[in-house]
Regions:
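Short acidic/histidine-rich active-site segments
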Residues: 183, 235, 264-287
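Alpha-helical scaffold segments that flank or form the walls of functional sites
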Residues: 28-32, 37, 45-100, 126-145
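Acidic/histidine-rich helix-loop elements
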Residues: 36-55, 114-121, 158, 241-244, ...
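Catalytic pocket-lining loop regions of alpha/beta-barrel enzymes
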Residues: 176-260, 268
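Divalent metal-coordination and catalytic microenvironments
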Residues: 33, 75, 175, 232, ...
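Mid-to-C-terminal alpha-helical segments outside catalytic/metal-binding sites
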Residues: 4, 11-20, 291-327
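Active-site gating/metal-coordination segments in enzymes
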Residues: 92-95, 100-102, 106-178, 231, ...
Length: 327
């Protein structure tokens, strides 16, 4: 579309990690939607006082070590501010493991705005974007850590509310200033295309948008969005889902194969939406690991005939093409 910001990758593009920018070509095998810690208490009570950092690090390290056995080098941590984002923990985990971790800026409006801070209601989209841009330019609080993407969320059961239009507008304005890709907790087709429309109205190309939880959308919707350039994030690979049920591993293999057959494998991102340390539970509660893609989904895709090159596309090429800085 004429006038839209170009988001085609160029040589030596960079990706912002918790330790600073790295060449996109060096990020390697990447899990694009995971969580280290999530705190569902709500924005009015959220804060670092809710957890002990070293306990979180101790809990999470073995799960990162496990995926390093599968040569995973990068993990995109999708927990937003006011939901348990902790850049200090992510930086320490990166230091302990040598992995690239990527955090985010943005606000999460899903669940009826429970995780949006009080100041949001009295601020314009431009003013909200200035907060997010400041995190990118100067770091998150005093951590020195800069976000590598914009993470927002909208409710998927209805048309976008005015609050959620403000969130996606703020994301568009932030993208224009920073070049960060926008990943939005979305789900079904309708909110996905409504958000794409808002982005286009602000001259943001659809290829700068990740449709998070796109498995909740229709195949037709996934194909239509991919044709526009949108990234299709199939991101809840979960071995705890009973075989034969919707969204089991076979379902994911089928959806990925269908997108391949439609010509859009190069727009697919895969992950687990797994983890995570829960501050309200003893020892952080039950932690779901990050290895199911390697133990179950990749073998299922290989059975469907996906080649080594196509697996490489899903695990390495697509993530770096999605998360590079567009500036």
């Amino acid at each position: 579309m004429a006038g839209l910001m170009s988001c085609s990758q160029k040589p030596e593009q960079m990706i912002m990690t918790v330790n600073g920018p790295v060449p996109a070509s060096q990020v390697g095998i990447t899990l694009t939607h995971e969580h280290v810690l999530v705190d569902f208490i709500g924005a009015d009570s959220a804060g670092y006082h809710r957890w002990e950092k070293q306990e979180v690090v101790k809990k999470v390290l073995p799960y990162l070590a496990e995926i390093q056995e599968y040569k995973v080098t990068t993990l995109v941590e999708c927990t937003p501010a006011y939901l348990g984002r902790d850049p200090w923990i992510l930086k320490e985990l990166s230091s302990e493991t040598g992995m690239h971790l990527i955090t985010n800026t943005g606000y999460y409006g899903a669940h009826n705005n429970l995780f949006i801070p009080e100041h949001f209601s009295n601020m314009s989209a431009r003013e909200i974007s200035e907060i997010w841009v400041d995190e990118f330019e100067n770091g998150i609080e005093e951590s020195g850590v800069k976000p590598g993407f914009i993470k927002i969320g909208v409710d998927g059961h209805d048309t976008l509310s005015k609050e959620h239009v403000k969130i996606i507008t703020a994301a568009a304005l932030t993208h224009q200033q920073t070049g960060l890709v926008i990943a939005s907790h979305t789900g079904p087709d309708r909110p996905a295309f409504e958000q794409i429309s808002v982005l286009q109205s602000h001259d943001v190309d659809p290829s700068c948008f990740i449709w998070v939880h796109a498995q909740r959308g229709s195949l037709e919707g996934n194909i239509r969005a991919a044709n526009m350039g949108v990234w299709i994030s199939l991101d809840n690979v979960n071995l705890n889902i009973e075989e034969g049920s919707e969204y089991d591993v076979r379902w994911y293999a089928d959806r990925i194969n269908e997108l391949k057959n439609a010509g859009y494998l190069n727009k697919v991102l895969i992950s687990h939406d797994a983890g995570w340390y829960k501050p309200e539970e003893a020892d952080g509660g039950t932690f779901r690991g990050f290895s199911g893609i390697f133990t179950a989904l990749i073998p299922a895709l290989e059975q469907k005939g996906l080649s080594t090159e196509e697996i490489h596309l899903l695990l390495e090429v697509n993530p770096r093409n999605a998360f590079f800085l567009r500036n």
